[in-house]
UniProtKB/Swiss-Prot annotation:
UDP-N-acetyl-alpha-D-glucosamine binds at R93, R122, P123, V124, D125, L126, K162, V163, S164, V165, D307, I329. GO terms for biological process: cell division; cell wall organization; peptidoglycan biosynthetic process; regulation of cell shape; UDP-N-acetylgalactosamine biosynthetic process. Phosphoenolpyruvate binds at K22, N23. Cell wall formation. Adds enolpyruvyl to UDP-N-acetylglucosamine. It comes from Haemophilus influenzae (strain PittGG). This is UDP-N-acetylglucosamine 1-carboxyvinyltransferase. The modification 2-(S-cysteinyl)pyruvic acid O-phosphothioketal is found at C117. Its EC number is 2.5.1.7. Its main location: cytoplasm. The keyword Hydrolase does not apply. The lineage of its organism: Bacteria, Pseudomonadati, Pseudomonadota, Gammaproteobacteria, Pasteurellales. Pathway: Cell wall biogenesis; peptidoglycan biosynthesis. The keyword Protease does not apply. Keywords: Cell cycle, Cell division, Cell shape, Cell wall biogenesis/degradation, Cytoplasm, Peptidoglycan synthesis, Pyruvate, Transferase. One of its GO terms (cellular component) is cytoplasm.
Length: 424
C-alpha cells in the first residue's frame, strides 16, 4: 500500500493548474448513459474514481476511451447490460448515479449498494424515493438496488426532504427522459449540479433553474451527443489556496473560477490572506504571515463547503487564536483531528463541533488518512511540520486529487510516494 513521505518546513509558493472537478465529472459520466450518440468530454481528471466509473460504464456496454489529448470519448448507443456490479461499485458511493439514467432510458437497472469514504451516513434513500415518485418500482435484494418501470418515467413535483447533491442529480438525470414536467423543490445548488445540467441541455434536455433550489425539467424523448468541458475543481483550488495560507506562501491557481468559492475566499481574507481574482485565476499571498483563526460552519452551497472543512481545521491548528468549527453536513468528519493532535495540534471535539487552539509549530510523525479531504490535510500538515511525516492509506487522495505530489513539488514541497514494503 502506497504512502507519502513528506519533509517539512516548506513555504509553498508558485503556480498550479487546477484540474477538472471530480464532483462534476462523475455525474456527467453517468449521465452519458442517457445519450444515443457519441459524447466527447474534456478537462476530465485522471483519478481512481474516474477510472472506476469508466469501468462501470464499460461493464454496461459503453465504449469509453481517452484519446491522445486526454479527452474522454464515450458511446452509449449499444448498452446491453443493466447491472453495476459489487466488485466495481464497492469502492465508490457515486456509483448509485448509474441507476437513474438506466431506468430513464432502458426502464430497468440495478446497482450494488455502494462504498466510498467512511464519513458517516450518506443514505441512498433520497435517490430511491425520488425515482419511486417518478414511477419506478424499486426493491432491495441481495445487496442490490433494483429498479424498473413498465414504460417511461412520469414527471411530477418532488420535494427533497434534506438538501442532497446526490439525490438532486439522480432525479434531474431521470427526469430528462420522463413524460411531462418534473419540478425539484429544495434542490441542492452546487456548481457541479449546474455543470451537469449544462451538459444534459447540450444533449437536448430541457432543464431550467439549476443553481437555485427550484429546478424544472421538461422531459424529452431522447438525448443526443455533444462535446463538453468539465468545470474546474473548486475544492482542489481551495486546497492549494490553503497550502499557501498555512505556509506563509504565495500561490496562483490557474484555470479556475472564483465565483464558485466565495465562502472560502471570504474566510481566507478573514484569516489575513491577500486574495486577488481574475476571470480564470485566483492568487493568494500570505506575505510570510501566520494566519488568524477563523470560525467555520459548513452548509450546503452557497455556504461553506464541507469538503474544505478538514483543510481549514489544519489552518486553525496553526493559526493565531482559538476557533470553533461546526460540521453540519456529514457525521464522523473530524477523523483527521486526532491525527493532527498527534502532530502537536490542540483541539477538543464535542459532537459536531471542534474547538481548535492554534500552535506555532506542528511536528512530523506517522499518520493515517481516513477519507479524501482528511488525507490532504495531513499531507499539507506534513509540508509545514518540523521533521518527517509519513502519511499512510493515501489511496484516499488518489480518488480525488490528480497528480497531487507533482503539483505540490511544483510549489516547493518535499514529498515522495513509496510502497509500504519499501520502508525497511
Amino acid at each position: 500500500m502506497d504512502k507519502f513521505r513528506v519533509y517539512g518546513q516548506s513555504r509553498l509558493s508558485g503556480s498550479v493548474n487546477i484540474s477538472g472537478a471530480k464532483n462534476a465529472a462523475l455525474p456527467i459520466l453517468f449521465a452519458v448513459i442517457l445519450a444515443t450518440e457519441p459524447v466527447k468530454l474534456t478537462n476530465v481528471p485522471e483519478l481512481k474514481d474516474i477510472e472506476t466509473t469508466l469501468n462501470i460504464l464499460r461493464q454496461l456496454g459503453v465504449i469509453a476511451n481517452r484519446d491522445e489529448t486526454g479527452a474522454v470519448l464515450l458511446d452509449a448507443s449499444n448498452i446491453n447490460h443493466f447491472t453495476a456490479p459489487y466488485e466495481l461499485v464497492k469502492t465508490m458511493r457515486a456509483s448509485i448515479w448509474a441507476l437513474a439514467p438506466l431506468v430513464a432510458r432502458f426502464h430497468q437497472g440495478q446497482v450494488s449498494l455502494p462504498g466510498g469514504c467512511s464519513i458517516g451516513a450518506r443514505p441512498v434513500d433520497l435517490h430511491i424515493s425520488g425515482l419511486e415518485k417518478l414511477g419506478a418500482d424499486i426493491v432491495l435484494e441481495e445487496g442490490y438496488v433494483k429498479a424498473q418501470v413498465s414504460d417511461r418515467l412520469v414527471g411530477t413535483r418532488i420535494v427533497i426532504e434534506k438538501v442532497s447533491v446526490g439525490a438532486t442529480l439522480s432525479i434531474m438525470m431521470a427526469a430528462t427522459l420522463a413524460k411531462g414536467t418534473t419540478v425539484i423543490e429544495n434542490a441542492a445548488r452546487e456548481p457541479e449540479i449546474v455543470d451537469t445540467a449544462d451538459f444534459l441541455n447540450k444533449m437536448g434536455a430541457k432543464i431550467s433553474g439549476a443553481g437555485s433550489d427550484h429546478i424544472t425539467i421538461e422531459g424529452v424523448e431522447r438525448l443526443t451527443g455533444c462535446e463538453h468541458s468539465v468545470v474546474p475543481d473548486r475544492i482542489e483550488t481551495g486546497t492549494f489556496l490553503i497550502a499557501a495560507a498555512i505556509s506563509g506562501g504565495r500561490v496562483v491557481c490557474q484555470n479556475t473560477k472564483a465565483d464558485t468559492l466565495d465562502a472560502v475566499i471570504d474566510k481566507l481574507r478573514e484569516a489575513g490572506a491577500q486574495v486577488d481574482v481574475t476571470e480564470n485565476s485566483i492568487t493568494l499571498d500570505m506575505l510570510g504571515n501566520r494566519p488568524k483563526a477563523v470560525n467555520i460552519r459548513t452548509a450546503p452551497h452557497p455556504g461553506f463547503p464541507t469538503d474544505m472543512q478538514a483543510q481549514f481545521t489544519l489552518l486553525n491548528m496553526v493559526a493565531e487564536g482559538t476557533s470553533i468549527i461546526t460540521e453540519t453536513i456529514f457525521e464522523n468528519r473530524f477523523m483527521h483531528i486526532p491525527e493532527l493532535i498527534r502532530m502537536g495540534g490542540k483541539a477538543e471535539i464535542e459532537g459536531n463541533t471542534a474547538v481548535c487552539h492554534g500552535v506555532e509549530q506542528l511536528s512530523g510523525t506517522e499518520v493515517i488518512a481516513t477519507d479524501l479531504r482528511a488525507s490532504i490535510s495531513l499531507v499539507l500538515a506534513g509540508c509545514i511540520a518540523t521533521g518527517e511525516t509519513i502519511v499512510d492509506r493515501i489511496y484516499h487522495i488518489d480518488r480525488g486529487y490528480e497528480h497531487i505530489e507533482d503539483k505540490l513539488r511544483g510549489l516547493g514541497a518535499k514529498i515522495e510516494r513509496f510502497s509500504g514494503s519499501d520502508e525497511a
